[in-house]
Amino acid sequence: MKTRKSVKARKTVNAGKSTRSRKPRKAKPAGSVVALSNEQVTRVLKLLKGANSVELKFVVPATGHRATIAGIGLDPVEAQPRQAFFFDTPGLDLNKAGLIVRARRIQGGRADTVVKLRPVDPATIDPGLRRSGSFKVELDAMPGGFVCSASLKGTCTAQEVLDVTTGTTPLRSLFSKEQLAFYDAHAPAGIGMDSLVTLGPTFLLKAKHNPKNFDRRVIVEMWLYPDGSRILEVSTKSLPQEGFQVAAAFKAYLAES
């Protein structure tokens, strides 16, 4: 088993070598050559009718992280550090059921929470939930795939998250009554929220960028996992009726960056 220190040391040495001997190679977002089938397009159009927003996301291969950040023109120093905790059973029963329970600490003492279900069919969602200001239906689209999710968000303090993850207070205390009811309605039978274990934390850096050659905000997130692996995600959002047009423009923007 690799320790965090050994992984960091190995990556530091390798990074030093590559920086001096190689020019960063620009990499296309993973899966960028995969197009949706006619059947998938029809399905997306149906889902868009019930969605509040669309998130368009590309995952950049590890070989292209440095070049992508440089090409976008992002200053990594301006990225905001965050710490994400996921909650599930040891056997990941929530994940298998499509249910996500997460708390996220944000720089400055703030934090937020979410209970998310995916996939969902927007047509089957309770109209009462839709009236909540904390509830959102979003279509997550990536090259060659898509999924519709329903989520209830909440806020808390960073200290409250720490109190839960250290066992000082119960997990349910982080979430609102709406979130708890949503969890109870969709969790596998017999799995109460306070029986969940903490997974993580996962450290991430999030940066918001307003490019000159693209007419909307771009979000860049670098996820640094406990095992030493990294994922770089580049995303933007649009209204449902703009989804296909923004997707084409976003793809062109990334290709030129």
Located regions from the model:
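Phosphate-end processing signature that detects enzymes handling 5′-triphosphorylated RNA
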Residues: 2-4, 10, 17-257
